[in-house]
Regions:
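Short, flexible coil/linker segments at domain boundaries that flank nucleotide/cofactor-interacting
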Residues: 1, 84, 161-162, 183, ...
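Surface-exposed loop/turn positions
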Residues: 114, 164, 254-255
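S-adenosylmethionine
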Residues: 159, 191-298
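Conserved SAM/SAH cofactor-binding pocket of Class I
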Residues: 139-224
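N-terminal auxiliary segments of SAM/dcSAM-dependent transferases
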Residues: 2-127
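A short, charged helix-loop
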Residues: 131-137
Length: 298
């Protein structure tokens, strides 16, 4: 079947936003390419997953309304980056070829810490004795390839999750929530303002044999006012700053917090927003992104 393909110019700082918007629009696949046209779907451990001149490519079914797609992308871009012009783009009609299958074939497992692997659901796991998170990227808004997701997964791989309750705020694909449960958490609430993300979280949890009662999902306005042991939030610096008080209310005294989706130059502002409630003691960076960890004041 033919496909509609859109390719947008991007940088490491804005590529994830474009990825998310394309997936929210119903892209069958999203890939990242450098100037040499080599796609990166999952980076080899220790390598840099994005280039300064990155192209984000989305693949859509032939009946996609291109004008509506561009309008959605433009509005989303303006909301995320009000001072930047919408990036240059190219729209193409691709003739019959199984581009989605080609993309799936190149998605590889990636390891975090000593025990945690994120694996495509259609490939054999590298280590059957490890904690293996099976993911279908076609249902995902995060696969572990972006530095912010990788930073959070690395943190999850290092924690003791026994008997812990958790909120994954901005759950997207549910990858962080699922990882926490597989590592031993009792329950993780997945929260997102997009219903498609909630559906993706449910689907990916079921793929990993996790009951909906273990990873319940809800919209932000429906989040129960019940504090948890661990707060995860991989979104963007602006919303994180705006929600500092709310996330503190949802975290138990002496509870842990891990925040990402933050550029290096934004770290101080995020730390300042959370310091009234947390001891923000660790900043870990990957490429131009950081993760900030902390402990709720007792």
């Amino acid at each position: 079947m033919p496909w509609v393909q859109i390719t947008l110019s991007a940088t490491p700082e804005n590529s994830e936003v474009l990825e998310d918007m394309l997936l929210l629009c119903g892209a069958g696949a999203v890939s990242l390419l450098d100037g040499a046209d080599q796609p990166v779907f999952e980076p080899i451990k220790g390598t840099t997953p994005l280039w300064q001149d990155t192209r984000v490519m989305g693949l859509f079914e032939a009946d996609t309304d291109a004008d509506a797609l561009l309008e959605y992308l433009s509005n989303g871009w303006q909301a995320a980056f009000p001072s930047l012009h919408f990036p240059s783009y190219k729209l193409e009609i691709l003739e019959d070829k199984d581009w989605e299958r080609q993309w799936m074939d190149r998605f590889e497992p990636i390891q975090f810490g000593a025990r945690l692997w994120v694996c495509p659901s259609w490939k054999p796991v590298p280590d059957p004795t490890a904690v293996n998170l099976m993911l279908d990227p076609g249902l995902a808004f995060g696969t572990g390839s972006h530095p912010t997701t990788a930073l959070c997964l690395q943190w999850i791989a290092e924690q003791d999750w026994q008997h812990k309750t958790v909120i994954d705020y901005g759950c997207g694909s549910g990858i962080l929530a699922i990882a926490a449960v597989l590592m031993g958490a009792d329950q993780v609430m997945g929260v997102d303002n997009d219903t498609q993300a909630l559906t993706a979280t449910i689907d990916n949890a079921q793929r990993n044999g996790i009951a909906v009662t273990t990873i319940p999902v809800c919209l932000p306005e429906d989040t129960p006012n019940k504090a948890v042991d661990v707060m995860l939030a991989n979104i963007l610096a602006g919303p994180l700053i705006d929600m500092a008080e709310r996330l503190s209310e949802l975290t138990k005294p002496a509870g842990l917090i891990a925040l990402s989706g933050i550029l290096q130059h934004q770290a101080d502002a995020v730390i300042a927003a959370y310091e009234p409630w947390f001891n923000m003691h660790t900043v870990v960076s990957k490429d131009e992104w950081v993760r900030i960890d902390g402990i709720r004041h007792s």
